[in-house]
Amino acid sequence: MERTFVMVKPDGVQRGLVGEVIGRLERKGLKIVAMKMLWIAREMAENHYAEHREKPFFSALVDYITSGPVVAMVVEGKNAIKVVRTLVGATNPAEAAPGTIRGDFGLDVGRNVVHASDSPQSAEREISLFFSDDEIVNWEKADEDWIYEER
């Protein structure tokens, strides 16, 4: 099974959307194997968004993600990265399809409720930035045989 990183951003936490995001992930059949609420330190935020360091919006992005608590998760499932990205929707909520998290709840590209890894490499990097190995729980859902034809 593939793992990916998902984070409910400060706007999602402040608007009470944490449960909605978790519910959508779980109803899709994905499994949460790690989760915590934290207030991201500036250094961690800069590492998380390192690929945007030279872009003009970098400082504002770091300011925003450190402005309030977030909920960080490791989510597991078959094709988890692609499945989660589809559930989340386009980065710009105005372009996100109805029925996606951003399409239903996002109002602004800078306040788009949730972050999700976009590749296996970014998932691995982001998971290791936010979680130690002993914080990730390996467990089997009772309904996995009903969700996946093959595992």
UniProtKB/Swiss-Prot annotation:
Pfam families the UniProt entry points to: NDK (PF00334)
Organism superkingdom: Archaea
Gene Ontology BP, a term: GTP biosynthetic process
InterPro entries in the record: NDK-like_dom, NDK-like_dom_sf, Nucleoside_diP_kinase, Nucleoside_diP_kinase_AS
Top-level EC class: transferase
Cofactors (names): Mg(2+)
Coiled-coil region: none
Enzyme nomenclature, EC number: 2.7.4.6
Catalytic activity annotation: a 2'-deoxyribonucleoside 5'-diphosphate + ATP = a 2'-deoxyribonucleoside 5'-triphosphate + ADP; a ribonucleoside 5'-diphosphate + ATP = a ribonucleoside 5'-triphosphate + ADP
GO molecular function terms listed in the Swiss-Prot or TrEMBL record: ATP binding; metal ion binding; nucleoside diphosphate kinase activity
Function: Major role in the synthesis of nucleoside triphosphates other than ATP. The ATP gamma phosphate is transferred to the NDP beta phosphate via a ping-pong mechanism, using a phosphorylated active-site intermediate.
Family: Belongs to the NDK family.
Name of the protein: Nucleoside diphosphate kinase
Annotated source species: Archaeoglobus fulgidus (strain ATCC 49558 / DSM 4304 / JCM 9628 / NBRC 100126 / VC-16)
